[in-house]
A protein has these predicted regions:
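Unusually extended, aromatic-enriched hydrophobic runs near protein termini
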Residues: 1, 11-18, 63, 70-73, ...
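N-terminal start-of-chain detector that recognizes signal peptides
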Residues: 1-4, 23-26, 73-75, 86-88, ...
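Generic serine detector
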Residues: 4, 53, 57-59, 182-185, ...
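Short, functional N-terminal and low-complexity linear motifs
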Residues: 4-10, 35, 116-118
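N-terminal active-site beta-alpha-beta segment that forms phosphate/nucleotide-binding
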Residues: 11-91, 96-100
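SAM-dependent methyltransferases
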Residues: 1-25, 30, 50, 86-89, ...
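Conserved phosphate- and dinucleotide-binding cores of soluble alpha/beta proteins
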Residues: 95-213
Length: 213
């Protein structure tokens, strides 16, 4: 058994239990061993007549969800904006869509989400607005404790994510979080989601593969 196989075995052992822990906190939660199964589960959760939007996420692209939604659903796509002003308006409209799809920076084994956001539109939609939120969570994002999840979000996810943006920050240069107060920081909103209310509004799809960063 090679390293990759061992990883999947461990994910398959842990994933269903983590899904159970999310369910105990009011989330609707599923474990899917593969990206392909995760895509089918996500599509089964999104009615054909829903207007769909999304937050910045590598994971929703890696399972093929965003490309499928773009082709088969009515969407609110900020990347289709013709100007910065229109982009902002589309991001605002996305807060009232039917289904919002996103990834997460970190999750915990006891069933919590932890996210860091720049503009705040992604975490705003998670907290309130869309009728439902579908969150794609690679098992590599699952940390043992909340403290570990915070460390993961700040020192792993955020510095890597920041490499996609031009505004200079210390982590672009060093690859490490400096807890900066830079104008170009994407670490502006820190949101812990410890329960889902109303119950079932947030759907968690845990995936037995490494997704995103």
């Amino acid at each position: 058994m090679d390293r990759s196989d061992m990883m999947h075995v461990m994910y398959d052992k842990k994933g269903p239990k983590v899904a159970e822990n999310f369910a105990k906190r009011g989330f609707e939660a599923y474990y899917c061993p593969t990206k392909e199964e995760a895509l089918q589960k996500a599509l089964a959760l999104i009615p054909a007549d829903h207007v769909v939007s999304w937050g910045g996420s590598v994971s929703i692209n890696e399972i093929g969800l965003r490309p499928y939604v773009l082709e088969h659903y009515q969407v609110i796509d900020r990347d289709a904006a013709a100007s910065p002003e229109e982009r902002v308006e589309l991001m605002r409209k996305a807060l009232l869509c039917d289904t919002f799809i996103m990834g997460t920076n970190a999750a915990t084994e006891d069933g919590q989400l932890y996210n860091i956001d720049g503009n705040g539109n992604r975490v705003a939609a998670l907290v309130y607005g869309p009728k439902q939120v579908v969150v794609i969570v690679g098992m590599n994002k699952v940390a043992p404790t909340l403290e570990d999840a915070v460390v993961r979000a700040r020192t792993v996810a955020a510095p890597i994510n920041k490499q996609r943006f031009a505004a200079p920050t210390p982590c672009i240069v060093t690859g490490m979080c400096a807890d900066c107060n830079s104008e170009g920081s994407i670490c502006n909103q820190f949101v812990r989601t410890r329960r889902c209310s109303p119950a079932g509004r947030i759907k968690i799809i845990l995936v037995g593969e490494n997704l995103g960063f």
